[in-house]
Design a protein with these regions (language model features):
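N-terminal intrinsically disordered, low-complexity segments enriched in P/E/S/T
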Residues: 1-56, 60, 76-138
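Alpha-helical transmembrane segments with an aromatic anchor "belt"
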Residues: 61-65
Length: 138
């Protein structure tokens, strides 16, 4: 599975927001690749923004709001990599989640247009989020 999974994660045309339940398989697939992998918790908006800023090393001008998040996610010049995989744990349905998904989808489209894969993977073992699965359950 990890061979097919890393091929998918390295394909810019498949960039987007997905749900996953098997985090270890994603981590195993990315390990040893040159993709940038970050794992953050989404308890609420402020925690998520702080966690992403820390994990991705956002610059000092990051304003800790949705617009600033999108600005940083579509720049990442300070964290150059051939691709990005964001694992987002503990997502809770609500307005903030919807906004976050929109920003991450937009960022994925931006990077795919530049030939870099960008995946936002929401850890959702209950399959409750309205997102496609990254890979099928066996």
């Amino acid at each position: 599975m990890s061979g097919k999974l890393i091929q998918r994660l390295q394909d810019p045309s498949r960039s987007g927001a997905y749900r996953v339940s098997r985090v270890e398989e994603v981590e195993d697939a990315v390990r040893g690749s040159s993709l940038c992998l970050v794992r953050v918790a989404f308890a609420h908006k402020a925690v998520l923004l702080n966690n992403l800023a820390s994990a991705l090393g956002f610059p000092d001008w990051f304003g800790h709001n949705w617009d600033a998040l999108e600005d940083c996610l579509t720049d990442l010049s300070w964290r150059d990599a051939p691709g990005y995989v964001l694992l987002i744990e503990s997502p809770r349905p609500g307005d903030d989640l919807g906004i976050l998904i929109d920003i991450l989808r937009s960022s994925a489209e931006f990077w795919a247009g530049r030939g870099k894969p960008f995946f936002a993977l929401f850890v959702d073992p209950a399959r409750a989020l309205p997102l496609p699965e990254l890979f099928r359950q066996s």
